[in-house]
Amino acid sequence: MDDDAGDGAASGGTKRKVTAASSSAAAKGKAAGKGKAASKASALATAKESSLLKQKSPAEFFAENKNIAGFDNPGKSLYTTMRELVENALDSAESISELPDIEIIIEEITKSKFNTMIGLVDRQRIDEELYDDFESAKAREKRLAKEARFQETQAKNAALGKKVKEAPAARGKGRGEAAFFRVTCKDNGRGMPHDDIPNMLGRVLSGTKYGLRQTRGKFGLGAKMALIWSKMSTGLPIEIKSSMKGQNFISFCRLDIDIHKNVPHVHLHEKRENKDRWHGAELQVIIEGNWTTHRSKILHYMRQMAVITPYAQFLFRFLSDSPDKNLTIQFARRTDVMPPIPLQTKHHPSAVDLLLIKRLISETTKQNLLQFLQHEFVNISKSHAERLIGEMGPDFSAKTTVKSLTSQQLVRIHQLFRQAKFDDPSGNCLSPAGEYNLRLGIIKELHPDLVATHASSPQVFEGHPFIVEAGISIGGKDVKHGLNIFRYANRIPLLFEQGADVITRTALKRINWSSYKINQQQDKIGVFVSIVSTKIPFKGTGKEYIGDDITEIASAVQSALKQCCLQLKSKIVKKLQARERQDRKRNLNRYIPDVARAIMETLGEIADESPPKRPRYDKEDEELLEKVNSEEVTEMTFRDCLTQHVEQVDYEMALEYAMQSGVSEEPREALYLNSLEGSYKFIDFQSPVFVFRFIP
């Protein structure tokens, strides 16, 4: 019985174990089921979320891809902000044919001042180890030891007369503390209509510069991208003052931009009294920046802009928290000759794509195909348009309504445009700086010893006209030895990514400088190339250089530089000849005393000989010997004669040099300097063609 009880107990225990095991398995299965269900639900949620259609506004796109517009980092953002404001100011003044007068101020703002501006109270640190610039005792000891070794090495170098290096600046691990700057740009240009200011500055990809024409801007963003960067880095709005000619009020607007909606957010928009009748615009924005890293780029930009726009006056000021770091530079105006205003032009048939053809059709006011071809494109006359329509096929006629064209017909038009022959577009719509302005700008800023300029005739690349202007200078101030290359596209300086640019590669690899008597390593050579076009073929996302793979542009740049080199070669050769002539004259004058002394000694010995022993001489020789004996002819006499002869030869060579240089062919005009006091004994008889002066 006990055994049976034991067996029963064992059996019951076994059953309980099985039941527990099955319960555990069921629980695990249930948990696994829940896990799978949760995973499936998560996957469905992810799929549903990924299937949602999202949109980004243009402002949001450029905010997330700010490097495209030149806002890679705080330093370059400061440079790009200043550049955009300056170029807008130039465009504004030139649009009303006003000589630009532009003032740029970059003011450094300390962290405490910035916090006060935004109403933020400075807070003392509580947990020092939380901050990136925290330095432990061990790290501090290590740094001080390293600095001591560096100072010891520098002291030894100084004692030995070697170059002493500056101590390296300490670098933090992270971004460090931000630096803020107020950038202000004031001009005397057109100004902006009061009601248009919010949309002109607070809505990305809206403006007045869109169309087929030569423009300074690369993206059409201008100050709008500076406002986006301000929104991202400081959160502060932009302030605008503007007034147009004839207005008795100044428009004041304080606004920022709604990044997600791409619409302006206006804080204040009002009219103020304009007592001085000022016209133009003044923009002020506060951004994060870095003056230290991009100081040289900003100053180089201003100097190069002063070269290409000598008709403009720039006043640049940097205001630091430390007065000893303040900087003021004025780039004075040198001429009042301004380039013509760029004209908007029509598209060349060979430069359009299918999408552009569709847009032109949707915007045209012309009804039939003949009128559309004749009026919406350049270089298509009526007869040419009729020939093109006849070539398109039986489905086309001169009276075909352009709005009714099918997609297949549009493709046919596009294909014919790519295959047909058209005259090249003219460069009348372009606005180059001009040789005169380029030369004046180079002379004004560099003060070179020699300068040559050349402007090419209009040429074409992919249906877009372009003009290349070049200048080369030798010598000058603040110019390094070797090649100093200054690049311009649509009259704005290009400072970044120089190595891959067509201008740089042409100057370095395609010009044999030595054949033009120019020493590429030792001479101070300034190479200036400006390319203007309705479409600059920039490379890279930042549009900082023009590619070297465009044969038409590379050939035009090389030709323009060679023309400048040829001009310089003739000048250099003439200078070398003049220098050789001066050296020859100096060397001859150096030997005159010795030659005169030798001649005098020889003649003295001959004169001392008795007549029977002396050879028979001509009468003139005998007279000379007698003068030597009587000391009527001395060593100084021969010196004077030789000096006079050298002067005569030098004069004849200089006259021949002048005649070869064409100086004698230039018109000459007599100039008279008369005292304001006193009377003169002559009479002038005036005639339309001459003045006859009678001097008694």
Curated annotation (Swiss-Prot):
Q: Name one GO cellular component term.
A: nucleus
Entry keyword annotation includes Nucleus: yes
Alphabetized InterPro entries for the sequence:
HATPase_C_sf, Ribosomal_Su5_D2-typ_SF, Ribsml_uS5_D2-typ_fold_subgr, TopoVI_B, TopoVI_B_transducer
Q: Where in the cell is it found?
A: Nucleus
Annotated region (Disordered) at 1-36
Residues given in the record as ATP binding sites: 88, 187, 208-209, 217-224, 543
List all Low complexity biased stretches. 20-36
Q: What is its EC number?
A: 5.6.2.2
Q: Which reaction does it catalyse?
A: ATP-dependent breakage, passage and rejoining of double-stranded DNA
Q: Tissue specificity, please? A: Highly expressed in flowers before pollination. Expressed in roots and shoots.
UniProt similarity note: Belongs to the TOP6B family.
Question: What role does this protein play?
Answer: Component of the DNA topoisomerase VI involved in chromatin organization and progression of endoreduplication cycles. Relaxes both positive and negative superturns and exhibits a strong decatenase activity. The B subunit binds ATP. May be involved in cell proliferation and stress tolerance.
The protein, known as: DNA topoisomerase 6 subunit B
Q: What is the originating organism of this protein?
A: Oryza sativa subsp. indica (Rice)
Taxonomic lineage from the root? Eukaryota, Viridiplantae, Streptophyta, Embryophyta, Tracheophyta
Q: Which gene encodes it?
A: TOP6B
